[in-house]
């Protein structure tokens, strides 16, 4: 049909170009102040803190997923009438940032000690101002609706004050102490590391079994095995299981160390697995976490045999001064000379911790550090979830939460760095120490502790320090506790648990309780844990595999909306997400489909006006409006349960499969018949659909909705309320039957090789009995049929079973004579058959390959099987069609 120009359609570009449009739209949002939060507002508050990315970082796919979810939640709540604060900020990232600046200095042959601490820290601040925070621009590219006027940094003055305040309070409460305990030690960075900064990789090493005690089998001796034979220089004991009869007679005795004047005590400990190896383990308390615990239980000496550079020291042996790896070879050779080597396994694959930043092998090492005593804090964090003050989504993650907080070890909070929050402890000339709070002055002449705090310590204060704590502020009153924390399950312990511990520790403060006007608070009422992103085959992304996806590249190719929709559609609570380029391309195509549908509606005069009474509408109108209300309810339910995938699936299938593929086609027929109210239904459906899609696809929906409504912005539009229109079941059944009838006729046309758009004479019977009299026009139009003439001679017949119970039928007689070029159709089908048979052979060969089946991920095998099944079905279909081709 012909369409007349529409001024509303003229507001749209000819096609959707995200690269040209998205940044312009985002800047308009910023200029309009839509994302600014007002603590004085009378609206109910809703707040989310952005997990602060490292100031050194750039947007990775995990960020993109997390930010998409948070942006969707805050956009929806804003539309629902909440005063929304999405708090942005960055983490000072102690080790990462110091490493970046040190590498820059190294280019000019300099090290940080050439400048001294104060000048070096100034240089780090200079780097932060000039080069740090690139991720903020990338967040804008993604469409993050954060309140940029409140952007914070974990070393801001206000946040630094909060850090010193809570350190002082924890110290005064006896919850911070200094002790020599085992840590992850980086010999390159020369600092303790947190567990999350240690990456475990499989390496090929060696497993050396050697003998302590006599070389005579009839005399007391024990064989032990280790992958770090150099650590035997620090051995002070040998552990066996108390029930292991092989060694019971030796428990309590000693064996001499072969290189050092030291006796090794043989102890009975249930940690030992008697079935593993020889059932005996060497105990190096200062250089192995399990051995450290055994050493504590049995009061074993704990000599530290490596310095901060992992050089052997203080053993009084020839190995002193050797690097640990040099010593590994030398100790093994010395043991061999004495005849103590029992077995050498080489190569021996095993998992070894490496520094995430510097890449070297981590050395467990006894070190004097500052610690938080976590027992009472962890209990409070656990109780907050047990009591329902904080709810974890999905609930299946609760068990992991309790496993961590109920068995948490004390937290090492000191780092041997220059960049970070300096530990507020001062030492006097005679070894005295004092903790100095933010409003106190250290004694004159005393020296401050040189260490800085673990980055996770300051980020653990993030939910309340960014809102002004320890001061009583309007922001704390309005936006605390925060509404939800969105983060990955992989940092549930490292960040979430620590926020809960410190949040509950200050939860009863006047600043939090508003001077006692409300009870103690938790840092967030809900926690949503998302999974990890994997490649399209379900494999973990890694640089070594070459399968790391850059979200910025995908946004450049397909647009931010497409990336966001892909991530939201693929996510499930707590589940990992596998995506590939085909997924984001499909999302881009979905956006294009929406654009074209809206443009068509506007060109045909779609405008928001009051809808006629339902009785004045057609079956198609009542069906689409009823389905829209069902989808609205499902989307609301899904968002409320943080089921982003369910919301997106409902919207995708409604928009594409029902609205675009069917209702638009029916609307064309209705408009051709002069049913002018159709434009109102089109507009009403699009208005609701675009508002529902806006949280996930904000850019294209903004453009389309503004053209449709000519109103200011979807960002401040209202969220769709229940329409009161329930699905008309009679109308829905008629539409369903009509769709099936049209689909079957179209399938028949395709099988017959009819030319696209070629109309075919047909006669339909059983229409009245099937309650489809009102749908005949749609069937004729959509299936490209013409009325049967007086000399109609059907050459084909098909019967289509209809109705909810398949108890009704419409018989379609068609005259296809003269409509097919048989020779050309045969050539086309033979070409298609060859392609289908090639695919069938290829997939069959893969599935017959035992090596492939053993090594390929299950998801890949399933895909190959699906391809084989479809190729078989296509082959059979074409063969049958060729056989019947006359």
Curated annotation (Swiss-Prot):
CDD domains: Anticodon_Ia_Val, ValRS_core. A motif ('HIGH' region) lies at residues 53-63. One of its GO terms (cellular component) is cytosol. Keywords: Aminoacyl-tRNA synthetase, ATP-binding, Coiled coil, Cytoplasm, Ligase, Nucleotide-binding, Protein biosynthesis. Catalyzes the attachment of valine to tRNA(Val). As ValRS can inadvertently accommodate and process structurally similar amino acids such as threonine, to avoid such errors, it has a 'posttransfer' editing activity that hydrolyzes mischarged Thr-tRNA(Val) in a tRNA-dependent manner. ValRS has two distinct active sites: one for aminoacylation and one for editing. The misactivated threonine is translocated from the active site to the editing site. The C-terminal coiled-coil domain is crucial for aminoacylation activity. This is Valine--tRNA ligase. It comes from Mycobacterium leprae (strain TN).
């Amino acid at each position: 049909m012909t369409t007349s120009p529409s001024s509303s359609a003229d507001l749209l570009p000819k096609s959707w170009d995200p690269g040209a449009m998205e940044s312009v739209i985002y800047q308009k949002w910023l200029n309009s102040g839509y994302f600014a939060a007002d603590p004085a507002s009378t609206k109910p508050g809703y707040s989310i803190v952005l997990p602060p990315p490292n100031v050194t970082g750039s947007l990775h796919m995990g960020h993109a997923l997390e930010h998409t979810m948070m942006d969707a939640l805050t956009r929806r709540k804003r539309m629902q009438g909440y005063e929304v604060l999405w708090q942005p900020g960055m983490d000072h990232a102690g080790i990462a940032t110091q490493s970046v600046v040190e590498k820059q200095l190294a280019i000019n042959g300099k090290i940080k000690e050439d400048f001294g601490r104060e000048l070096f820290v100034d240089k780090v601040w200079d780097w932060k101002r000039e080069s740090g925070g690139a991720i903020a621009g990338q967040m804008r590219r993604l469409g993050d609706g954060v309140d940029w006027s409140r952007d914070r940094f974990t070393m801001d003055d206000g946040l630094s004050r909060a850090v010193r305040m809570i350190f002082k309070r924890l110290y005064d409460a006896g919850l911070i102490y200094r002790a020599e305990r085992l840590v992850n030690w980086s010999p390159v960075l020369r600092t303790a590391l947190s567990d999350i900064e240690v990456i475990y990789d499989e390496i090929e090493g060696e497993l050396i079994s050697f003998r302590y005690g006599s070389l005579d089998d009839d005399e007391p001796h024990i064989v032990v095995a280790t992958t770090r034979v150099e650590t035997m220089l620090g051995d002070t004991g040998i552990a066996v299981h108390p029930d292991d009869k092989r060694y019971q007679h030796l428990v309590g005795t000693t064996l001499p160390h072969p290189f050092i004047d030291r006796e090794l005590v043989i102890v009975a400990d249930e940690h030992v697995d008697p079935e593993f190896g020889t059932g005996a383990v060497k105990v190096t308390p200062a250089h192995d976490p399990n051995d450290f615990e055994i050493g504590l239980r049995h009061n074993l000496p704990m000599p530290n045999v490596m310095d901060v550079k992992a050089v052997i020291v203080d053993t009084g042996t020839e190995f002193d001064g050797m690097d640990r790896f040099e010593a590994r070879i030398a100790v093994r050779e010395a043991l061999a000379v004495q005849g103590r080597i029992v077995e050498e396994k080489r190569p021996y694959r095993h998992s070894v911790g490496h520094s995430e930043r510097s890449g070297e092998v981590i050395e467990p090492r006894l070190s004097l550090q500052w610690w938080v005593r976590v027992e009472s804090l962890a209990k409070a964090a656990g109780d907050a979830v047990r009591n329902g003050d904080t709810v974890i989504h999905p609930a299946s993650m609760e068990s992991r939460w309790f496993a961590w907080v109920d068995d948490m070890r004390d937290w090492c909070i000191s780092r041997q760095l220059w960049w970070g929050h300096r530990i507020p402890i001062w030492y006097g000339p005679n070894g005295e120490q004092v903790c100095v709070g933010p409003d106190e002055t250290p004694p004159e002449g005393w020296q401050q502790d040189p260490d800085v705090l673990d980055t996770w310590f300051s980020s653990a204060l993030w939910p309340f320090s960014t809102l002004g704590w320890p001061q009583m502020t309007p922001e704390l009153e309005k936006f605390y506790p925060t509404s939800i924390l969105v983060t990955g399950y992989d940092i549930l312990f490292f960040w979430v648990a620590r926020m809960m511990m410190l949040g509950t520790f200050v939860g009863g403060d006047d600043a939090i309780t508003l001077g006692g006007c409300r009870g103690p608070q938790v840092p967030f009422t809900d926690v949503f844990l998302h999974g990890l992103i994997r490649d399209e085959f379900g494999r973990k992304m890694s640089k070594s595999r070459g399968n790391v996806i850059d979200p910025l590249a995908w946004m450049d190719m397909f647009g931010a909306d497409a990336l966001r929709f892909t991530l939201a559609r693929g996510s499930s609570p707590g589940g990992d997400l596998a995506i590939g380029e085909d997924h984001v391309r499909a999302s881009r195509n979905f956006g294009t489909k929406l654009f074209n549908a809206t443009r068509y509606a506007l060109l045909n005069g779609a405008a928001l006006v009051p809808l006629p009474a339902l009785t004045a509408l057609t079956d198609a109108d009542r069906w689409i409006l009823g389905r829209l209300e069902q989808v609205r309810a499902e989307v609301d339910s899904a968002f409320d349960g943080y089921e982003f995938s369910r919301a997106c699936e409902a919207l995708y299938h409604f928009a594409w499969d029902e609205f675009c593929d069917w209702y638009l086609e029916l609307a064309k027929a209705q408009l051709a018949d002069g049913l002018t109210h159709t434009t109102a239904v089109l507009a009403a459906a699009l208005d609701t659909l675009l508002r529902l899609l806006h949280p996930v696809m904000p850019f294209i929906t903004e453009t389309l909705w503004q053209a449709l409504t000519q109103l200011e912005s979807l960002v401040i539009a209202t969220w769709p309320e229940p329409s009161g229109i329930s699905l008309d079941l009679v109308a829905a059944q008629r539409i369903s039957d009509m769709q099936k009838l049209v689909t079957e006729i179209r399938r028949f046309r395709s099988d017959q090789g009819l030319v696209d758009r070629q109309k075919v004479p047909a006669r339909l019977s059983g229409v009245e009995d099937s309650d489809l009299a009102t749908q005949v026009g749609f069937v004729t139009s959509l299936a490209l049929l013409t009325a049967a003439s007086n000399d109609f001679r059907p050459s084909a017949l098909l019967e289509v079973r209809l109705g909810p119970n398949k108890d009704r039928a419409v018989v379609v007689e068609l005259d296809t004579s003269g409509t097919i070029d048989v020779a050309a159709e045969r050539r086309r089908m033979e070409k298609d058959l060859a392609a289908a048979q090639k695919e069938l052979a290829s997939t069959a060969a893969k599935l017959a390959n035992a090596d492939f089946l053993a090594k390929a991920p299950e998801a890949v095998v399933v895909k190959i099987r699906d391809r084989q099944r479809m190729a078989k079905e296509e082959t059979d279909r074409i063969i049958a069609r060729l056989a019947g081709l006359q």
